[in-house]
């Protein structure tokens, strides 16, 4: 289901996004310098990265494969004839005075990706966002303002790191759609294994183009919000810029096209410079790099190495396993989590997908988050979690006892069966034993019995709780409910 984004103070919002995603090759796009983050400044740059006279770039073949994977992941036309261009501008962290990019013949052409907006909420909907293009380029260095008092340093470790710049169509009409789009692209590049996409390290950052206009009027003047590297900042920056542009127009002014920065402390955007157009960069073909022709054999090899896409797997989780779109979205938040869930399902059967989803998204994910661990670092393997769920399904233990067993699984290498046996946690299903407990509970809680007989349903829940407490949580809840009603009514 799709839906029309609401107006904001009577204005329609138009948003397009450019994402700069570093590719996770071991060396840079045109040199053999390493790409390890966090090293001492200027220790990972060769003379190629530094722009020494006479040096020649050599293309890293790994970036081609990764870019093709992305193109296939967004259903795009793939550029089999690739050229590189020079984007000319001056900035201290750009040692050559130009950036090598792809202007004329990008490796990824038009495509699309479907996003889920407001996931898990009543107003949840899907929307298709067009991809204009995605092209390869080299990253710039980094200006460092806090290393030396009253001076700015330049760290060129990042210069030459391979990037894929992903340009969307201006198809987003709300803050929520924009954030959902960025999250979906982030999920895809990590799923494909082409980028670590660690936003805090700058390996995945977004430039957001925002404009507003009244319905049935031409699009407004856009402003670009530069270098946003967290989902929270993206949300806040867009919201702030929308409000600013509306205020300018309502006050009788005109929005000036500009590049702006978001100040999170003041929660506002501020002008950085007037926005450049393509001709300001004087693009021309890079004479040092030959065209790259991608063969059918290369395309077939990359396609054969493609994993099942998150969008396809989400659809399978809904249609084949009967999960909600929200559950499918959460479980496919990372390829590792999704694979873990499927491993559990391989053991307990797809008919039990809902209980498996509840345990993976609930107890397991909660414990991982609490301990700041990833799913790959989980002390409980998929096989051991499946063993626990099997014992819930066959009524060996109750759901409440299962949480206790889970805690022991987290702290040890033992199986659920071993823990249940050692701790004496097996569920009590003997009717006679449960009836004996109920007799005592009824005798000691006559007032509660009278309340239930008088029509107070909550009193019955209290009696159930007393029975479960007396059995130390071991009594089968379904049996307790049935026997209680039978014995109270007798």
Swiss-Prot record:
<dbReference type="Pfam" id="PF02934">
    <property type="entry name" value="GatB_N"/>
</dbReference>
<dbReference type="GO" id="GO:0005524">
    <property type="term" value="F:ATP binding"/>
</dbReference>
<dbReference type="InterPro" id="IPR017959">
    <property type="entry name" value="Asn/Gln-tRNA_amidoTrfase_suB/E"/>
</dbReference>
<dbReference type="InterPro" id="IPR018027">
    <property type="entry name" value="Asn/Gln_amidotransferase"/>
</dbReference>
<dbReference type="GO" id="GO:0050566">
    <property type="term" value="F:asparaginyl-tRNA synthase (glutamine-hydrolyzing) activity"/>
</dbReference>
<dbReference type="InterPro" id="IPR004413">
    <property type="entry name" value="GatB"/>
</dbReference>
<dbReference type="InterPro" id="IPR006075">
    <property type="entry name" value="Asn/Gln-tRNA_Trfase_suB/E_cat"/>
</dbReference>
<dbReference type="GO" id="GO:0006412">
    <property type="term" value="P:translation"/>
</dbReference>
<keyword id="KW-0436">Ligase</keyword>
<keyword id="KW-0547">Nucleotide-binding</keyword>
<comment type="similarity">
    <text>Belongs to the GatB/GatE family. GatB subfamily.</text>
</comment>
<keyword id="KW-0648">Protein biosynthesis</keyword>
<protein>
    <recommendedName>
        <fullName>Aspartyl/glutamyl-tRNA(Asn/Gln) amidotransferase subunit B</fullName>
        <ecNumber>6.3.5.-</ecNumber>
    </recommendedName>
</protein>
<comment type="function">
    <text>Allows the formation of correctly charged Asn-tRNA(Asn) or Gln-tRNA(Gln) through the transamidation of misacylated Asp-tRNA(Asn) or Glu-tRNA(Gln) in organisms which lack either or both of asparaginyl-tRNA or glutaminyl-tRNA synthetases. The reaction takes place in the presence of glutamine and ATP through an activated phospho-Asp-tRNA(Asn) or phospho-Glu-tRNA(Gln).</text>
</comment>
<comment type="subunit">
    <text>Heterotrimer of A, B and C subunits.</text>
</comment>
<dbReference type="Pfam" id="PF02637">
    <property type="entry name" value="GatB_Yqey"/>
</dbReference>
<dbReference type="GO" id="GO:0070681">
    <property type="term" value="P:glutaminyl-tRNAGln biosynthesis via transamidation"/>
</dbReference>
<dbReference type="InterPro" id="IPR003789">
    <property type="entry name" value="Asn/Gln_tRNA_amidoTrase-B-like"/>
</dbReference>
<dbReference type="InterPro" id="IPR023168">
    <property type="entry name" value="GatB_Yqey_C_2"/>
</dbReference>
<dbReference type="InterPro" id="IPR042114">
    <property type="entry name" value="GatB_C_1"/>
</dbReference>
<keyword id="KW-0067">ATP-binding</keyword>
<dbReference type="InterPro" id="IPR017958">
    <property type="entry name" value="Gln-tRNA_amidoTrfase_suB_CS"/>
</dbReference>
<dbReference type="InterPro" id="IPR014746">
    <property type="entry name" value="Gln_synth/guanido_kin_cat_dom"/>
</dbReference>
<dbReference type="GO" id="GO:0050567">
    <property type="term" value="F:glutaminyl-tRNA synthase (glutamine-hydrolyzing) activity"/>
</dbReference>
